[in-house]
């Protein structure tokens, strides 16, 4: 056997061993490296109507935005959303939750069953909101939830779980 072949085998075994050790270290974490959702960005064909939905129907606050890439930043004090205006609303494609990759829906917690029912009534009377289903048990319960599409078509689930 020549020395080059032996050296190649030796180097290959070192690289293989080091790679395996590195992969086992990378793949094993003692705790999650993430700390929750920082923010979520939703693309909308109608920035004004979507902003109104979050502020007027849900009571969120506008805390910023950009004019050059039309957007509004809204928050409920716990979650921060960026609403991004599509470039050409007439060419926007509605998300198909069964065939597209992407955000299936946003789920928001509601403090009480009364609040959930009140929100359902507000959504019924909000222009551009489509109700997919009214408050109902999620599976066998105890969670009660409802699903809507906000004025730009993004699906939002509202969920109350008794404590």
Where are these regions (language model features)?
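Vicinal oxygen chelate
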Residues: 45-48, 106-152
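Bacterial N-terminal signal peptides that target proteins for export
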Residues: 1-7
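A short acidic/small-residue loop/turn micro-motif
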Residues: 139, 162-163
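N-terminal beta-strand motif that seeds the catalytic metal site of vicinal oxygen chelate
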Residues: 23-48, 103-108, 162
């Amino acid at each position: 056997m020549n020395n080059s072949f032996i050296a190649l085998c030796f180097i290959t075994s070192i690289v293989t061993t080091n790679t395996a050790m590195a992969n086992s270290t990378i793949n094993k974490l003692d705790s999650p490296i993430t700390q929750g959702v920082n923010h979520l960005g939703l693309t909308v064909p109608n920035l004004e109507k979507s902003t109104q939905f979050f502020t007027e129907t849900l009571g969120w606050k506008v805390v910023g935005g950009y004019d050059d890439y039309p957007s509004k930043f809204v928050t409920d004090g716990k979650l921060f959303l960026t609403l991004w205006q599509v470039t050409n609303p007439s060419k926007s494609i509605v998300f198909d939750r069964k065939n597209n990759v992407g955000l299936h829906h946003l789920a928001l917690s509601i403090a009480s069953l009364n609040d959930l029912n009140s929100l359902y009534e507000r959504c019924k009377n909000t222009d551009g909101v489509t109700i997919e289903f009214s408050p109902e048990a999620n599976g066998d319960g105890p969670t009660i939830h409802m699903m809507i599409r906000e004025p730009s078509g993004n699906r939002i689930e509202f969920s109350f779980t008794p404590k």
